[in-house]
């Protein structure tokens, strides 16, 4: 054994682990699955669901694996009669008040409680008293609530406190009367708030626009990239008979981890908006008239004459393939007037623009920087995933500074704010060194 590892035994199998590593992390690493509800690798340990109880040699009672650090010589049994009995007892308690909503619940087919109840639940309930009922909360247009289904794992609460930095959900009352709700009945409005839908292990928090529109097993999962996210967050599109029904995050530790911005989760609704242009139109005598594709292409071909008089603008959100096709069309027409910088006004230094803008480090390394300076951006609104990484850096002690025309709200400590005029004056009068000194 080295100083960096300890030797333990899991179900008779010798395993090396880091000192202080939580037992549930070790069992996951070797494929010895331990059931859980409150544990999540991106959140702090709560140990309040008790589903991950395991048997440890010498312990007087089963111990929650999510809250037990490993130690030298520990012998763990995840499938012993005592461990299984404890897990089944926990499941029975969880199901006492849980409603039989599976046939209509949007979480059906991908519900962690449903899956584990098959393995650890009883066929017949011994509980004859009335079930607890909780009033649903209206917490905004994006997340629907069925709080009678809530098992109080507090994943959503910890997400607000630890990931968002803006606690929006909390617990009130105690014991079996505990209720999770927003403070003073407010809506949740953080840029990442809808990630609680994915975190919820049951059907208590659901995707409101998607509600009752499809079942999990009916849809096809397509891997893609978020179209409105400048960092390229990885996502899955869930498609039913050619129609996008919902967007969920695709895990990528180097970019978005396991989160996506609400904008990227719900922007697919624009595809099917009533005011979206679905058919080609032509303007005649100041009025728009719908035409078929053949007439539209003929009209476009007739109008596209004279390479020097043509210009093409591509959406910055267009795919690489779409951009390539537009460039191919521009080449065929003999024009070089093609651009994607729709909002840019100053092109005086465009010859020095990088072909591929780059931070100088990977997105994942951003959270390990000692100092971060953001210029001219409301990073929370424009790139929520980057804002999340910057917040992680700030929590580790990084100095974070902003230069912009307006001061925006951030859920971490900001060391310096410079107005655009202040930054310009410093650069003009004293150069970059003065800016660095100002930010120290």
Question: What would you call each of these model-derived segments?
Answer:
Residues 1-22:
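Generic start-of-chain signal for non-secretory N-termini
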Residues 14, 37-42, 146-147, 181-188, ...:
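Conserved short loop/turn motifs at secondary-structure junctions
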Residues 20, 66, 249-250:
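Residue-level structural signal for beta-strand termini and adjacent loop
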Residues 23-57:
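A basic, amphipathic helix-loop patch mediating RNA/tRNA/ribosome contacts
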Residues 29-31, 70-78, 255-257:
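Short, surface-exposed linear segments at secondary-structure transitions and domain or protein termini
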Residues 50-226, 231-235, 240-243:
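Fe-S ferredoxin-like electron-transfer domains
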Residues 95, 99, 146, 153, ...:
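Catalytic alpha/large subunits of respiratory electron-transfer oxidoreductases
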């Amino acid at each position: 054994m080295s100083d960096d590892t300890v030797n333990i035994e899991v179900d008779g199998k010798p395993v090396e682990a880091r000192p202080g590593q939580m037992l549930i992390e070790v069992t996951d690493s070797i494929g010895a699955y331990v059931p859980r509800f409150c544990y999540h690798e991106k959140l702090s340990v709560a140990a309040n669901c008790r589903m991950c109880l395991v048997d440890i040699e010498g312990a007087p009672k089963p111990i929650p694996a999510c809250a037990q650090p490993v130690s030298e010589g520990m012998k763990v049994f995840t499938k012993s009669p005592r461990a299984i009995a404890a897990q089944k007892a926990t499941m029975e308690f969880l199901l006492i008040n849980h409603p039989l909503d599976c046939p209509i619940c949007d979480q059906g087919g991908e519900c962690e409680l449903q899956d584990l109840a098959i393995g650890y639940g009883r066929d017949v309930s011994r509980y004859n008293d009335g079930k607890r009922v909780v009033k649903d909360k209206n917490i905004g247009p994006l997340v629907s609530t069925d709080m009678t289904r809530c098992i109080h794992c507090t994943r959503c609460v910890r997400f607000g406190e630890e990931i968002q930095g803006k606690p929006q959900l909390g617990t009130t009352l105690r014991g079996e009367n505990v209720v999770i709700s927003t403070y003073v009945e407010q809506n949740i409005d953080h840029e990442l708030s809808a990630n609680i839908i994915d975190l919820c292990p049951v059907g208590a928090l659901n995707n409101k626009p998607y509600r009752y529109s499809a079942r999990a097993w009916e849809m096809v999962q397509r891997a893609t990239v978020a179209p409105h996210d400048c960092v390229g967050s990885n996502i899955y599109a869930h498609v039913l008979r050619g129609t996008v029904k919902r967007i969920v995050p695709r895990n990528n530790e180097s970019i978005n981890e396991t989160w996506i911005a609400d904008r990227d989760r719900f922007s697919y609704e624009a595809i099917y908006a009533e005011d979206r242009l679905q058919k080609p139109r032509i303007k005649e005598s100041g009025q728009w008239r719908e035409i078929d594709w053949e007439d539209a292409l003929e009209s476009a071909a007739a109008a596209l004459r004279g390479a020097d008089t043509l210009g093409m603008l591509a959406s910055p959100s267009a795919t690489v393939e779409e951009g390539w096709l537009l460039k191919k069309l521009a080449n065929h027409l003999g024009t070089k007037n093609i651009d994607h910088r729709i909002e840019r006004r100053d092109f005086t230094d465009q010859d020095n623009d990088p072909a591929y803008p780059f931070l100088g480090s990977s997105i994942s390394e951003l959270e390990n920087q000692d100092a971060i300076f953001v210029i001219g951006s409301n990073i929370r609104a424009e790139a929520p995933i980057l804002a999340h990484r910057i917040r992680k850096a700030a929590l580790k002690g990084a100095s974070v500074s902003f230069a912009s025309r307006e001061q925006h709200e951030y859920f971490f400590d900001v060391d310096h704010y410079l107005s655009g005029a202040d930054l310009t004056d410093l650069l003009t009068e004293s150069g970059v060194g003065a800016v660095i000194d100002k930010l120290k």
